[in-house]
Design a protein with these regions (language model features):
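Active-site mouth loops of central-metabolism enzymes
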Residues: 21-34
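Short catalytic-loop micro-motif centered on adjacent basic/acidic residues
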Residues: 49-53
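Alpha-helix-loop-beta-strand connector modules within alpha/beta enzyme cores
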Residues: 59-70
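N-terminal basic/disordered segments at the start of proteins
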Residues: 1-12
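Non-catalytic positions within long, well-ordered alpha-helices that form the structural scaffold/packing
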Residues: 41-44
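Secreted/extracellular ectodomain signature
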Residues: 31-37, 59-60
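Short aromatic-glycine-(Arg/Gly/Cys) micro-motifs in beta-strand/loop hairpins
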Residues: 11, 15-20
Length: 70
């Protein structure tokens, strides 16, 4: 299974990202919840099956990302 980890902070979502194992594991830095929603949808479209969020999202932010990805 491919998975990703989204981290929230002073990041540039287009630049602050990394992957290992040929993209099977990815990490993406996002500046806000809206960017996290965009990136989560992109990751799912690319076949990521599990997205983990850092604790900085809080319950409300995590809920918004979950809603954005269905």
């Amino acid at each position: 299974m491919k998975f990703a980890f989204l981290i929230l902070g002073a990041f540039d979502e287009a630049r602050d990202r990394a992957q290992i194992a040929g993209g099977a594991a990815q990490i993406v830095g996002v500046p806000d919840v809206e960017a996290a929603c965009r990136q989560a949808q992109r990751l799912m479209d690319e076949g990521i099956g599990c997205i983990e969020l850092c604790g900085a999202f809080g319950e409300a932010g995590a809920r918004r990302v979950m809603q954005a990805t269905g």
